[in-house]
Regions:
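Short beta-strand->loop
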Residues: 70-78, 145-148
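Ligand-binding "clamshell"
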Residues: 62-74, 89-90
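Short, well-ordered beta-strand elements
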Residues: 1-9, 27-33, 100-101
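Alpha-to-beta junction loops
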Residues: 45-55, 99, 122, 143-146
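Beta->alpha turn/N-cap motifs
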Residues: 9, 36-37, 47, 51-61, ...
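Short, hydrophobic alpha-helical packing/hinge segments within bilobed ligand-binding/sensory domains
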Residues: 39-41, 49, 113
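A conserved helix-loop-strand patch within extracytoplasmic ligand-binding domains
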Residues: 74-123
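Short helix-initiation/N-cap motifs at beta->coil->alpha
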Residues: 31-42, 129-149
């Protein structure tokens, strides 16, 4: 029995297809779904899982550094697309001064979100912030957006 932890969608959905194919090859796969990004790594570190499937390499590296864990990547997979959704506002250009913008609360995905906001001209980050950018790296915020993690 191979036990893999995954986020519900798309990862667990993908594993459900793989489970059928693995069964044909004589393998049993158990999929444990997690709705957060911490538990699958702590479960893997403690030996409750054989593998997990939900994160990109920058997140894994940051998790190991922050939590002092020893997880390793088994290989590369697809990279989740990331987008900006205007919510109640019809377009990003229509965002009002002082509007609240939510970003992920983990280091690498927060940085990705901030880089997208910068690409849209909504904020400016200090030079070199890259995939470690946080709210503290915002050097220009003309619309005075409230960035909420």
């Amino acid at each position: 029995m191979i036990v893999i932890g995954a986020s519900p969608s798309p990862h667990a959905d993908i594993l459900k297809v793989a489970k059928k194919e693995l069964k044909k090859e004589g393998y049993e796969l158990e999929i444990k779904e997690y709705s957060d990004y911490v538990q699958p790594n702590t479960a893997l570190e403690s030996g409750d899982l054989d593998a997990n499937y939900f994160q990109h390499k920058p997140y894994l590296d940051d998790f190991n550094k922050q939590k002092k864990t020893h997880l390793a990547s088994a290989g590369t997979i697809h990279y989740e697309p990331f987008g900006i959704f205007p919510g109640k506002t019809k377009t990003l250009k229509a965002l009002k001064n002082g509007a609240t913008v939510a970003v992920p609360n983990d280091t690498t995905n927060e940085a990705r979100a901030l880089l997208l906001l910068q690409d849209q001209g909504l904020i400016k980050l200090k030079d070199g912030a890259g995939l470690t950018a946080t709210k503290k790296d915002i050097v220009e915020n003309k619309k005075d957006l409230a960035i909420k993690e």
